[in-house]
């Protein structure tokens, strides 16, 4: 967010989410192919290759993650430093150079630097500012959004989709194939979100998307609750899953990282983002650990009904407490929270 022009910031930050969905899809495809390979070959020796990719194929699935990890590590060295952070630390010349590369205009870069310096000069130390009522409110809202988003089921579906499909009676191979379709819809919908997030607006996407998520989650719960009496096929479950993933990918998955990267003033952005990010991963960890327990003890129907219920407080928080940030500079958003300049959401 800190190296993006305001009118393009939403789609540029959402590229992160697109990269995540491409990673999920790639993992599903690789795992599907490796499973097919292991099932079509018989172990004829004790070689390392056969041990990893046939006898104990999970080792091959895990080991393939090394390749994108190395690519990620390499790309880090080409990422520019945040110009706002450089200006904050007194390295104005380096900050101005980065801004000139972004805006391709010396005049616009200078204007942006002056605005950033003005906002920075009005703020206190990082920890003191973090505890101010307006900023503390933004941090609490960010934490709530990060955690609640995980308990709306998205990572439960992405992590445990094959297991959930197997509970519906599908074979291991068919379950992985269905999960590939889930990953494909997730990726394509994220591309759509990139195209519309700066035109439609963050909050509208959340309203429409979360409403669709609630409906899809309720239908999934109904499927598991009355599957036999209604005579529903696994294709109905697949359609509901794809509908859920579509609504999720076009709304909260695309919006959450944008909102969290926009909400905080420059002097506390690093700390506040760390708190929000930590909260998000705590939520991810909890849902990753709790989902198998919920599927076993709450039943699949109860689990998805719970996910649907968790969508309600998320929607209320975004509706009542989060300002619309589309098209606004980070400095304008900062002034909203610090009450230096009120801009109607």
Q: Which residues make up each language-model segment?
A:
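Alpha-helical transmembrane bundle of multi-pass membrane proteins
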Residues: 1-94, 98-100, 120-344
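Short, well-structured alpha-helical segments
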Residues: 106-118
């Amino acid at each position: 967010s800190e190296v993006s022009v305001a009118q393009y910031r939403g789609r540029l930050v959402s590229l992160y989410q697109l990269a995540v969905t491409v990673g999920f899809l790639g993992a599903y495809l690789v795992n599907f192919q490796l499973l097919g390979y292991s099932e079509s070959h018989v172990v004829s020796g004790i070689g390392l290759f056969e041990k990893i990719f046939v006898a104990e194929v999970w080792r091959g699935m895990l080991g393939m993650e090394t390749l994108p990890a190395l690519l990620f590590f390499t790309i880090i060295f080409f990422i520019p430093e945040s110009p706002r952070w450089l200006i904050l630390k007194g390295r104005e010349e380096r900050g101005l150079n980065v801004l000139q590369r972004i805006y391709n205009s010396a005049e616009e870069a200078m204007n942006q630097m002056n605005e950033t310096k003005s906002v920075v000069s009005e703020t206190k130390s990082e920890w003191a500012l973090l505890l101010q009522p307006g900023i503390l409110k933004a941090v609490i809202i960010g934490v709530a959004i990060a955690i609640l988003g995980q308990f709306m089921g998205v990572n439960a579906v992405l992590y445990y989709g094959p297991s959930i499909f197997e509970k519906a009676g599908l074979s291991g191979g068919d379950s992985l194939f269905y999960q590939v379709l889930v990953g494909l819809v997730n990726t394509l919908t994220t591309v759509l979100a990139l195209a519309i997030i700066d035109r439609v607006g963050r909050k509208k996407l959340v309203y429409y998307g979360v409403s669709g998520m609630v409906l899809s989650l309720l239908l999934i719960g109904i499927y598991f609750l009355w599957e036999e009496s209604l005579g529903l096929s696994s294709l109905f479950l697949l359609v509901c899953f794809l509908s859920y993933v579509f609504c999720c990918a076009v709304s909260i998955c695309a919006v959450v990282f944008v909102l969290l990267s926009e909400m905080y003033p420059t002097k506390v952005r690093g700390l506040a983002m760390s708190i929000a990010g930590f909260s998000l991963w705590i939520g991810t960890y909890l849902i990753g650990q709790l989902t198998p327990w919920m599927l076993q003890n709450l039943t699949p129907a109860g689990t998805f009904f719970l996910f649907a219920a968790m969508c309600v407080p998320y929607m209320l928080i975004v509706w009542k407490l989060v300002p619309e940030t589309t098209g606004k500079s980070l400095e304008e958003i900062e002034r909203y929270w610090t009450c230096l300049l009120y801009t109607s959401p």
